[in-house]
Amino acid sequence: MSAAPRIGILGAGGRMGRTLIQAVQQAGYQLAAAVERPESSLVGTDAGELAGIGSVGVKVSGSLADVLKDCDVIIDFTAPAATAQHLKLCREAGVAMVIGTTGMSDEQKAELDEAATHTPVVYAANYSVGVNVSIKLLELAAKVFGDTVDIEVIEAHHRHKVDAPSGTALMMGEAIADTLGRNLKEVAVYGREGHTGPRDRQTIGFETIRGGDIVGEHTVMFIGEGERVEVTHKATNRMNFAAGAVRAAAWVVGREARKYDMKDVLGLNDVQV
């Protein structure tokens, strides 16, 4: 698409929503809409003032349906139930979506897959360029080490995060499991307590830390005899996630209807490991 994409932000009043508004402005794209819950006291507020960048002439709306016609693409970092409703509206209108909502159920993910047969959808647990490059490195490490190491995923986030493990940790685990020909649902071990017995090398362990204002940290350990390799990504602010999501929004407009991920956006699927 040659013209600057018209981008709508859902959950505009949240921390991520405000950062997304800033990212749209920094990228030079058009903020076409900002949406909050209809009962929110922020409805009617200038979206730019809300995000701390000054007036942009876009008022926060309490209804996605009312502003959808003004948008080429919607960015949604809200909650699973809300995202499911937004998908239905965007599917009917043929408006592209970029979804960063985590904690979705298998049923909700199936609904997303179905909607993506009607309108293009980018879905990723993490839109950071660094995280997605890290995942490519994890695939390489898993391919080289194979079954000769124990694998542990450790993630840390702020005290307000409600889902665990993080979507990014699971995304990393899935990438490793797929590379090794394992089913993550069968081999994942979430935390350990009591007499657990010897470790099964086929398993992939997950540990979760919640506290303070940690934006997001992920470390994957490939632990062998006499050595270990660690791949770590640390986010110090939310702008890297927001900038990646805005990049995905500009990329997906005009694409054929299907589900994409950040590896598609960044061209990482073309990089062989």
Swiss-Prot record:
Catalytic activity: (S)-2,3,4,5-tetrahydrodipicolinate + NAD(+) + H2O = (2S,4S)-4-hydroxy-2,3,4,5-tetrahydrodipicolinate + NADH + H(+); (S)-2,3,4,5-tetrahydrodipicolinate + NADP(+) + H2O = (2S,4S)-4-hydroxy-2,3,4,5-tetrahydrodipicolinate + NADPH + H(+)
Record function comment: Catalyzes the conversion of 4-hydroxy-tetrahydrodipicolinate (HTPA) to tetrahydrodipicolinate.
PANTHER family given in the database record: 4-HYDROXY-TETRAHYDRODIPICOLINATE REDUCTASE 1, CHLOROPLASTIC-RELATED (PTHR20836:SF0), DIHYDRODIPICOLINATE REDUCTASE (PTHR20836)
Binding of (S)-2,3,4,5-tetrahydrodipicolinate, residues: 158, 167-168
Name of protein: 4-hydroxy-tetrahydrodipicolinate reductase
Species in which this protein is naturally found: Acinetobacter baumannii (strain ATCC 17978 / DSM 105126 / CIP 53.77 / LMG 1025 / NCDC KC755 / 5377)
Pathway(s) where this gene product acts: Amino-acid biosynthesis; L-lysine biosynthesis via DAP pathway; (S)-tetrahydrodipicolinate from L-aspartate: step 4/4
Entry EC number(s): 1.17.1.8
Pfam families the UniProt entry points to: DapB_C, DapB_N
GO MF annotation, one: oxidoreductase activity, acting on CH or CH2 groups, NAD or NADP as acceptor
